[in-house]
Regions:
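Bacterial N-terminal signal peptides
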Residues: 5-15
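Short, low-complexity N-terminal intrinsically disordered segments enriched in polar/charged residues
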Residues: 20-68, 161-165
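Short loop/turn motifs at secondary-structure junctions and domain boundaries
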Residues: 52, 99-100, 126-129
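A solvent-exposed, acidic/Ser-Thr-rich amphipathic alpha-helical stretch
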Residues: 63-112
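Short, solvent-exposed coil/turn segments at beta-strand boundaries
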Residues: 66-69, 111-115, 137-145
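Short, surface-exposed coil-to-beta transition loops
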Residues: 102-104, 129-134
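Short beta-strand segments that buttress and anchor functional surface loops
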Residues: 118-125
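Short beta-strand edge/turn micro-motifs at domain boundaries
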Residues: 133-163
């Protein structure tokens, strides 16, 4: 009975209107939260688009397909990469040239409205311990329009045995 109630609560929670919230950050930046109901079918379409993009363009190194997935005015928040689809192509063309054995592997995904979250294992070559990456991509009208990421090197030793994935 407890499981049935928990499942029912989860289903109903996706049908309730989300509360709009605004969060202020240092420097005056504001982040608007969700407003309205979640569209789980659209969220799944967005997730599938982002996973296909990541697999084709990053894992298979097909930067020539960027225009299929990225808007022309793609917004980049990574401080080491410029904004725009053409800048994305230039950045990853150079990265793949410098690191021909680099690896980008999706471990898990999640969605929230028009945002898709990826938890990724990435490394430049087989001898590299790698990095744990969280990519956040915003999708609008079937195109990826914005990207944020957080990158953490995988340490040689850890205070626990849980691993990063």
């Amino acid at each position: 009975m407890k499981i049935l109630c928990a499942v029912l609560a989860l289903i109903l929670s996706t049908m309730l209107p989300a509360q709009a919230q605004t969060t202020s950050l240092p420097g005056g930046a504001k982040i608007a939260g969700l407003a309205g109901q979640r569209d789980l079918i659209q969220e799944e379409k967005n997730r599938a688009l982002v996973v296909e993009f990541y697999t084709e363009v990053l894992s298979h190194r097909r930067v020539d397909l960027a225009d299929k997935y990225l808007s022309a005015d793609y917004i980049q928040h990574n401080p080491y990469a410029a904004t725009g689809r053409e800048a994305f192509v230039a950045f990853f063309t150079d990265l793949f040239r410098r690191y021909p054995q680099s690896e980008h592997r999706i471990i898990r995904t999640a969605t929230d409205g028009n945002l898709v979250y990826l938890h990724v294992f990435a490394r430049n070559d087989p001898n590299d311990r790698g990095r744990a990456v969280v990519d956040i991509l915003r999708v609008d009208n079937g195109k990826i329009v914005e990207h944020w990421d957080v990158v953490q090197p995988i340490p040689e030793t850890s205070a626990n045995t849980n691993g990063m994935f």
